[in-house]
């Protein structure tokens, strides 16, 4: 089977990570794959915030947990790093563009044997005063909206292989 198709079939959301950070070259390759995601009219309306700083990651996780309704929760599952995908809401297809970036990030991670998971609530995070403060710290205006948090790390989970697919999801006309 073609290697790209194999990765697409075998990629899983990972929720158990070892604590060590990713190798710089692996992280850079994942980021680059995200930057090459398709975008509407090639406007490239996204920004990737690579979070390697444990204190910043903890701030994001606390906000995410609060939005989820579990203030003491750990919705980042111990991942040592994350890439926050933001999109410029001045562009009409900002959400779609950011979603394509998220897919590329997760598929690139899988191709490198690195675990990843899309963690929701990024949009809500950057609507909160604390999230807006983070945007300001990063030099970004309030037009930047959260699309997703791609948590990353070397996995503690066994590789799972193919996943079953639901029937009746394709209609040829």
Feature roles, as predicted:
Residues 1-173:
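Acidic, surface-exposed loops and disordered segments
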């Amino acid at each position: 089977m073609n290697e790209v198709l194999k990765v697409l079939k075998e990629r899983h959301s990972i929720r158990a990570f070892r604590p060590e950070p990713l190798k710089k070259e692996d992280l850079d390759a994942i980021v680059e794959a995200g930057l090459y995601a398709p975008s509407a009219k090639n406007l490239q309306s996204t920004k990737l915030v690579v979070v390697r700083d444990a204190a910043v990651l903890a701030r994001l996780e606390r906000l995410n947990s609060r939005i989820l309704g579990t203030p003491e929760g750990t919705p980042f599952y111990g991942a040592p790093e994350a890439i926050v995908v933001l999109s410029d809401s001045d562009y009409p297809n900002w959400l779609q563009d950011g979603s394509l970036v998220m897919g590329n990030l997760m598929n690139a991670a899988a191709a490198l044997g690195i675990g990843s998971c899309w963690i929701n609530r990024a949009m809500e995070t950057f609507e909160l005063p604390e999230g807006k403060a983070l945007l300001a710290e990063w030099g970004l205006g309030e037009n930047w909206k959260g699309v997703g948090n791609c948590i990353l790390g070397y996995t503690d989970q066994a590789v799972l292989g193919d996943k079953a697919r639901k029937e009746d999801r394709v209609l040829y006309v």
